[in-house]
């Protein structure tokens, strides 16, 4: 049986934690930041853990992750 390929777009955008959760950067921070408060800009600087239903889909595209 041939090896399964990992989607390159998923490989660049998401990472898997040691417990198996999917971690990604915050979305909606490319442009239009002048309309937002400083607090919302600061909160979006970090990363977030995806919910269970979305992470199940992402794990299908990364067959060799934990």
Curated annotation (Swiss-Prot):
A Pfam family annotated for this UniProt entry: Ribosomal_L35p
Compositionally skewed regions (Polar residues) per UniProt: 18-27
Biological process (GO), any one: translation
Family: Belongs to the bacterial ribosomal protein bL35 family.
An MF annotation (GO) of this entry: structural constituent of ribosome
Keywords: Ribonucleoprotein, Ribosomal protein
Biased composition (Basic residues): 28-41
Annotated InterPro entries: Ribosomal_bL35 (IPR001706), Ribosomal_bL35-like (IPR021137), Ribosomal_bL35_CS (IPR018265), Ribosomal_bL35_sf (IPR037229)
SUPFAM superfamilies given in the database record: L35p-like
Taxonomy, superkingdom: Bacteria
Region described as Disordered: 18-41
Gene: rpmI
UniProt keyword Nucleotide-binding, yes or no: no
Signal peptide boundaries: none
Cellular component terms (Gene Ontology): cytosolic large ribosomal subunit
Name of the protein described by the UniProt record: Large ribosomal subunit protein bL35
């Amino acid at each position: 049986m041939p090896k399964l390929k990992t989607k390159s777009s998923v490989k660049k955008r998401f990472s898997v934690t040691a417990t198996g959760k999917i971690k990604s950067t915050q979305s909606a921070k490319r442009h239009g930041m002048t309309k937002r408060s400083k607090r919302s800009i600061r909160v979006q600087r970090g990363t977030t853990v995806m919910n269970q239903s979305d992470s199940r889909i992402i794990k299908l595209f990364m067959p060799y992750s934990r």
